[in-house]
Amino acid sequence: MASATLPAWIKMPSFLKKILKLRGRRQEDESRSRMLSDSSTQSYQVNQLTSEGTEAGSTIPSTPSKGQALPTESKVRAREKSRHRRPKIIDQVRRVESLGEQASQRQKHMLETLINKIYTGPLGEELVQTLYLRIWAMEETPESLKILQMREDIRDQVLKMKTERWLRTLIRGEKTKLKDFQKRYEEVHPYLMKEKVEQIIMEEAWSLAAHIVQE
């Protein structure tokens, strides 16, 4: 086919002008469609990659950070530490019902007999009178004031119960010897230095229970 560009002196027929014009318009349309197609393809690929990246990121399991694991580990350690902690002597002193149960049969019988006399016989009356006078004569403390201001029958019962507690604290174990007796006093000595009323009651209990101790 002859070139679409003709010399200026040749007059182009009108039908040829139409053909060239249609061809040019068709080429422009094809070029524009290719550009749009390429642009759509690239956009689709980018969106697909972004979507895949988002989905992949959402499926990655989250792992607890080191800082989050520390509280759990510290709780476990604290629990184990408290499990192996030895009971304090003062905790044992305050649990009357669990004391004195492991004494030898002979000592246990003598201990229960002594406690029964404290609650029911003249020994108990003599004990509470001695304790009352010693507490009255001591340096004033909140605990001593509390006891001295009690009604007499209530005060006597409280002093007897406190004496029983100390008796069961001092006389316990398979067999209590004098060295065990003294060792238990040393165990509670720091507590008694702060609680003078308890010290007086413990000393009277010591005196009452001395005959039970095996040499």
UniProtKB/Swiss-Prot annotation:
Changing F181S: In strain: Isolate MVC11; avirulent mutant. The keyword Phosphoprotein does not apply. Keywords: Host cytoplasm, Host-virus interaction, Inhibition of host innate immune response by virus, Inhibition of host interferon signaling pathway by virus, Inhibition of host STAT1 by virus, Inhibition of host STAT2 by virus, Interferon antiviral system evasion, Viral immunoevasion. Its main location: host cell. The keyword Ribosomal protein does not apply. The disordered region at the N-terminus is involved in C protein self-degradation in trans. This self-degradation of C protein may play a role in the regulation of viral RNA synthesis. The disordered region at the N-terminus is also involved in the host STAT1 degradation in order to counteract the host innate antiviral response. Belongs to the respirovirus protein C family. This is Protein C'. It comes from Sendai virus (strain Ohita).
